[in-house]
Amino acid sequence: MFTHKIQIRIFDTDFLGHCHHLAPAMWFEEARNEIFEIFNPSMSREGWNLLLVHIDLDFKAQIQFTEREIEIRTRVARLGNSSITLEQGAYLRDGSCVAEGSVVMVYYDLKNQKTMRIPDEIREKLLGERGQ
């Protein structure tokens, strides 16, 4: 399991005083950086090889600015030939889950416009002690 702490920012909130519905999607993406680095250690544009093809997001409770910090937990739910499914959750300090979702990303050769098999060395890192 990969974990990432997010500081809730005032601009994450909306007119009603709770976090805007897009904030968790941005937090989840930020938390995926560690996974992006497994696929592309330099995080260079030239080496970018992941396409997000599906996203789900469910809200379990309101998230207030006063919470100040959210922990995003990410796990590899499925590792296919050329795709990876990640499940993510946003947790308050008391351990309660306030949002959860999943994404499917495809390992892709942008130059040749085709999917590629995820290499074994990447698979090992993804499924290592923190991957599942």
Descriptions of predicted regions:
Residues 7, 58, 104-106:
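Residues in well-ordered beta-strands of folded domains
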Residues 2-3, 64-66, 77-132:
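HotDog/MaoC-like acyl-thioester-processing domains
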Residues 35-71, 75-78, 98:
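Hydrophobic beta-strand-centered segment that forms part of the acyl-chain substrate-binding groove
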Residues 1-54, 110-132:
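Hot-dog-fold acyl-thioester-processing enzymes
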